[in-house]
Each structure stands twice: as structure tokens, then as C-alpha cells.
């Protein structure tokens, strides 16, 4: 279950240089529940038959859908003027259930995060030629995966990945 709202506008009706402003926003909410299989193994000694008995009880547990954040928000603010175009964007991604497990404390989720990106381009006086700059992950946000329980290091971090920033600067020719 969920919903999505999207709004995009170019503020052409504003006076003067402000009419080059652009704004985009997208918000998604998705809630989910799934039954995951779970087998509970029971062991006991039966004194009547003098045998060791192992029973498998198949059952389920309910949790979120794998790889699906509950909320996603994208916002970008930009400016377009003649051959210039620039955008600053923000992505918010809620935590994500990424791994199911028999033991609840071993189930894994990612941390929620926000990331900022910048994109700028300028058309040059030659037909089809432009210069561009793309900068991703300006705040150097990392991806963190956590166990729902406590790990051996007295925290619940399973994995932390650092991607850093990436910046692309170039000249593009389209013909």
C-alpha cells in the first residue's frame, strides 16, 4: 500500500531573472507486510520409545517487504537561463529491510540517508557543444547496514560502505 505525489514547475511567471527558477518534488510512501517462512526445530528424548526425536514445525513470521523503503523524497531546485542549466538535488531514502533471518536479531536493515547532488551545464557558441559539471554525494553520505540485534562488537553495524564524492567535468558534443 502506498501513494506517490509528484510536483514539477518552472516559475516562468515570476518577474525578471527569477522566471528561470525550477522546482521539482517527489514523495513516495510504500508500506508492506510479507509472510516469510520459518522452521522451528524441536529436539527431545522420548522415554516411552527410548529414542531421540527431532520435529520441524513450519510456520511464518511477518515483516516488511525486502529492499523497499517506507519513504522516498526527491527535491531539486534549479535555474535555467538561455544556454545555462543548473540543479541542486536532495534524495532522502528511508531505511530498507535487506535480509531476512530465522533469528529476529539477525535480520538486517540499512540506515536511512540523505544525499545531495549538483548538476550544471552551459551551452557553448558552437552548435551541439556544451560544458558540464556533475557532482554526486556532496555530503559524502555512507551506506550502513545494521543487524536488528547487537553484534559481537557491542553495536549492531554489519557493514559500512564509503563511496565519497564523485565529480565529472567535461565537454559534450551532440550531433
Q: Where do the protein language model's features map onto the residues?
A:
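Short, local alpha-helical segments
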Residues: 99-104, 112-117
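Residue-level marker for the onset of beta-strands and adjacent loop->beta junctions
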Residues: 35, 73-74, 116, 129, ...
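Extracellular loop and loop/strand-boundary signature of outer-membrane beta-barrel proteins
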Residues: 58-63, 102-108, 154-159
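Gram-negative outer-membrane beta-barrel transporters
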Residues: 1-97
Amino acid at each position: 500500500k502506498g501513494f506517490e505525489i509528484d510536483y514539477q514547475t518552472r516559475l516562468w511567471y515570476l518577474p525578471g531573472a527569477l522566471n528561470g527558477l525550477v522546482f521539482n518534488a517527489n514523495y513516495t510512501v510504500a508500506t508492506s507486510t510479507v509472510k516469510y517462512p520459518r522452521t522451528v526445530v524441536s529436539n527431545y528424548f522420548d522415554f516411552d520409545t527410548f529414542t531421540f526425536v527431532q520435529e520441524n514445525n513450519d510456520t511464518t513470521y511477518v515483516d516488511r517487504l525486502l529492499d523497499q523503503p517506507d519513504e522516498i523524497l526527491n527535491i531539486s531546485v534549479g535555474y535555467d537561463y538561455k544556454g545555462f542549466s543548473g540543479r541542486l538535488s536532495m534524495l532522502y531514502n528511508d531505511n530498507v529491510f535487506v535480509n531476512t533471518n530465522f533469528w529476529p536479531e539477525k535480520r538486517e536493515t540499512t540506515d536511512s540517508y540523505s544525499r545531495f547532488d549538483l548538476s550544471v551545464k552551459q551551452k557553448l557558441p558552437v552548435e551541439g557543444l556544451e560544458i558540464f559539471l556533475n557532482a554526486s554525494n556532496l555530503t559524502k553520505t555512507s551506506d550502513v547496514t545494521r543487524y536488528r540485534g547487537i553484534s559481537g562488537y557491542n553495536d549492531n553495524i554489519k557493514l559500512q560502505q564509503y563511496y565519497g564524492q564523485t565529480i565529472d567535468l567535461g565537454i559534450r558534443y551532440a550531433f
